[in-house]
Amino acid sequence: MTLRLSRRAYAEMYGPTTGDRIRLADTELLIEVERDHTLYGEEVKFGGGKVIRDGMGQSQLPAADVADTVITNAVILDHWGIVKADIAIKHGRIAAIGKAGNPDIQPGVTIAIGAATEIIAGEGLIVTAGGIDTHIHFISPQQIDEALASGVTTMIGGGTGPATGTNATTCTPGPWHMERMLQAADGWPINLGFLGKGNASRPQPLVEQIEAGAIGLKLHEDWGTTPAAIDNCLTVADDTDTQVAIHTDTLNEAGFVEATVAAFKGRTIHTYHTEGAGGGHAPDILKVCGEANVLPSSTNPTRPYTINTLDEHLDMLMVCHHLDPSIAEDLAFAESRIRRETIAAEDILHDLGALSMLSSDSQAMGRVGEVIIRTWQTAHKMKVQRGALTGDGARNDNFRAKRYVAKYTINPALTHGIAHEVGSIEPGKWADLVLWEPAFFGVKPAMIIKGGMIAVAQMGDPNASIPTPQPVHYREMFATRGGALARTSLTFVSQLALDAGIGARYGLAKRLVPVRGCRTVTKRDMIHNAWQPAIRVDPETYDVVADGALLTCEPAAVLPMAQRYFLF
C-alpha cells in the first residue's frame, strides 16, 4: 500500500528531499538538495509512535556493529555536495553517510541502529563541517567560547595572552611558551594548533620551536619579514613538513612584493592578509594570488565591503599594531594599509575563487565569532551585485555555496596539514559537526558536536520541566567536562615533536595529531578556490585589474545575517 505525500508534507515530516530548495538565513542564497540517500517509505525518525523502536527501525545488533550516534535525515552542505542523508558517528569519527535503520527488516540500510545508538534529529536541519580559523591571535582564552558557539571547532595561530607581541602577531615564541600553551590547550573543548615565531635568519631558533610542538611558523612584518628570514623559515619548514604563514612587509622596507615572491623560491606558503586593508605589501599584496605556490587567505574585518568598512579600520589598526596617532609616521603607516579600491576587489576575488580561505584575525582587527557570518554575507553581496556564478543556474546557488563553505573548512585543513582529520564531512574524519536551522544558518548554530559528542547547544532554563523554556542561550554540554574534554578534541603538533615524546614530557591529556603534507599542497589543491589570475594594482589609483578585467564593486549599505539576529 502506497501513501503519497505532498512535497510540503514530506519536508515537514522528514526534511527536504531531492529537488527541494533551502534559503540560507535571510540571504538571497538558495541551495538545492542534489541527492537523497533514503528510500522513500523506509525513512527512520525517533519519537513516540515513530520508526526507531525495538524490532522496527532499531535492530538487535550489538554495540560493535551499530553506530554510537546517528543524525537522521539531515541536509549536508560540504565542498563535495549538498545531499540529504543519515550520518553515523562511531568512536568519535564519522563512520558513514547513508541510510540508517534496521538491516534485518529494511532494504538499503548502510548504517545499523541498535540499543547502543543515540539519535540526534536532523530533520529540517543543515549540517556542515566544523569551521577552521587559521588566523588566531591567542590574546584571551575566552575567544574559544565565542568561536565554538559560532561553529568554529579548530583554531590555528599563535600567542601567549595579552602580551604586546601577541596583540599584533600570531606567534607563540620559543619552546617555553610553546609548552605552556600546549598545556593550556588541554583545558579547552576545541582543536588547537600553534605557530612559532618564524622571524630568524638562522635555522636553530626555528627548529627548536618545531621540536617543541609548533605545527608551523609565522613570519610577521612587526618582527621583520626580510627576504633572509623568509628564505630561512621556508627552508626549515621544508625540512620538517610544517607550514609557514606570512604577514608581509607593508612599508616595503626590505623589498617590494616581487622581492618577497622571489624569496619564496616557489615553495608553498600561506599568505595571511592577501587583502585590501589588513597589511602586507602596500598597495599590491593581492598580486600573490596568481602564484602557484601561494595559498592566500584574507580576514573578516573587511568582509564584505560596506559603507562602514573604511571608517572603523583606522582606529583598529592604531591599537593592534601599537601605533601612536600623534606621530605622523605612524599615521601614514596606518593610512597606507586602508584602500577602498583593494577592499572592493577583495570581495570579487573571493567570489571568483582567487582567495582560497577566510579567517578572523581575532582581537587583532578581526572578530573571532564572525568568520562564518561574514563568509556568507560576502557570498550574498556578490550574488546580489554580480549574479549567478558559472555552474549555477536560476534555481540554486549550489556551486557558490560549495566555494564559500570550502573557504573555512577544507581549504584551511589542506593548507595546514590537518585534512586527514578535519575539514569536511567524510567517513573516517573526526566528527566535528555543526547543526543549523536554515533560518539561522551561518549565524546561530543549533548544536555543535565535537569528536562525536555534543559540546555546545542552545539550551533553555536548566530548572524547567522541558529543555526549551527561556532563557535559551548557548550552554556547554558534557563533551566539555571532565575526562570527556580530552577525548573529544585534538591538539595538532609537528611530527618532529610527536616523535620527541612531548605528550608525556609536558603531561598532556589530549590526543596529539601530527600535521602532514604541508609542503606539497599548492594553489591547485584549493578546492573551488584555485584561480590564479595575473593581478596588477595601480600604484596611484589602487585600481585592481585581474586577467585584464577591472575589479570593482559598490559598498553594501544593508547586509543580511546582521541586526535582525542580534536584538539582545
Swiss-Prot record:
Cofactor(s) this protein cannot do without: Ni cation
Active site: H321
Cofactor note: Binds 2 nickel ions per subunit.
Pfam annotation, one family: Amidohydro_1
Residue positions, PTM N6-carboxylysine: K218
Metal-binding as UniProt keyword: yes
Catalytic activity: urea + 2 H2O + H(+) = hydrogencarbonate + 2 NH4(+)
Residues that bind Ni(2+) 1: H135, H137, K218, D361
Subunit structure: Heterotrimer of UreA (gamma), UreB (beta) and UreC (alpha) subunits. Three heterotrimers associate to form the active enzyme.
Protein name in the entry: Urease subunit alpha
Source organism of this protein record: Burkholderia pseudomallei (strain 668)
